[in-house]
């Protein structure tokens, strides 16, 4: 974990990702990427010299109409003294039952991102942190190339003016 914290600290400083007084919504899927990010940001608060607040947010798409079980994530957030919110959505129903998408990933991702932005604003956050790794970046690059005919990937920091939030 020490090596990961070093990488996180370097990225925070190099890309000016966190400032004093920031309130950061951490998107938590329950997977290893988002949980490592959450733990890392919680640990860094102790010694990085930047005062910031963390809010954990999980979007439950309720695939097949069934709510997810995020009790282990809730327990982790409680142990880290991080407020945690589960947002029940109808994304699964919209993507699969109403729209009947043949390639659901893009629509699902856009809907989740929009719902996360709304939730972050609702809970007073000015920034959103998402856990990604190299495989995510490569997958995004290839999907953009084949599906949209463009070369591109996500940047470490972006600003969404219509929501006044940094992601």
Tell what function each PLM region has:
Residues 1-151, 155-156:
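ATP-dependent adenylation/nucleotidyltransferase module used to activate substrates
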Residues 153-167:
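Short, flexible loop segments at boundaries between secondary-structure elements
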């Amino acid at each position: 974990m020490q090596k990961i914290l070093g990488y996180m600290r370097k990225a925070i400083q190099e890309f000016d990702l966190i400032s004093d007084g920031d309130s950061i919504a951490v998107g938590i899927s329950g997977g290893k990427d988002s949980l490592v990010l959450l733990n890392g940001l919680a640990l860094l608060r102790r010694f990085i010299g930047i005062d910031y607040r963390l809010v954990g947010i999980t979007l439950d798409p309720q695939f097949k109409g069934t709510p997810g079980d995020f009790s282990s994530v809730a327990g982790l957030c409680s142990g880290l003294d991080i407020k945690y919110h589960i947002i029940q959505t109808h994304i699964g129903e919209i993507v699969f039952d109403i729209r009947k998408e043949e390639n659901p990933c893009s629509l699902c991702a856009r809907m989740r991102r929009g719902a996360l932005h709304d939730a972050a604003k609702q809970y007073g956050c000015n920034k959103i942190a998402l856990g990604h790794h190299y495989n995510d970046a490569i997958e995004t690059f290839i999907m953009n190339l084949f599906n949209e005919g463009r070369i591109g990937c996500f940047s470490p920091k972006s600003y969404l003016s219509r929501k006044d939030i940094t992601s």
